[in-house]
């Protein structure tokens, strides 16, 4: 299942609904760890790999990691970079795969970036569930119509098949460094 929300309370409630006690969760855009803390409560026997590129996240996530022990691993990195995806994919494969992909990249901004990150990461990790917090994507979905029906039952687009880690996209070089 792929769930798209905007309101932070709805996002965190969605996490409570989908995260199971032994899940492996990859969290893209953890910021200072408020949602990470909720995930750790829902998955006390699981693993959480949380990523963020902001300087504010590093200190707070180190504190949270000390509190929670080996349950949480924080990686300071830009989720748009191929090397970061490769690093996380390797870690996830060693621990048995990704159950939940959680994406919160600024909430209301850059729906194109949120979708590209979702597409590349979910195509690679093939999670059972994905939750994305982004106002632009939610607005797009509710403002759109289609006469065609294509469904995916998992947290990734099944129409992607088994492509694995996508090759480097030239388009990624065009993304704004301000994100």
Which residues make up each language-model segment?
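S-adenosyl-L-methionine
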Residues: 1-22, 56-94
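Conserved class I S-adenosyl-L-methionine
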Residues: 22-31
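Glycine-rich SAM-binding Motif I of class I
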Residues: 33-37
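Gly/Ala-rich phosphate-binding loop of Rossmann-like dinucleotide-binding domains
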Residues: 40-41
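Conserved SAM-binding motif I beta-strand of class I
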Residues: 47-52
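Short SAM/SAH-binding signature in class I
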Residues: 92-105
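C-terminal substrate-binding/active-site "lid" region of AdoMet-derived donor-dependent transferases
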Residues: 107-179
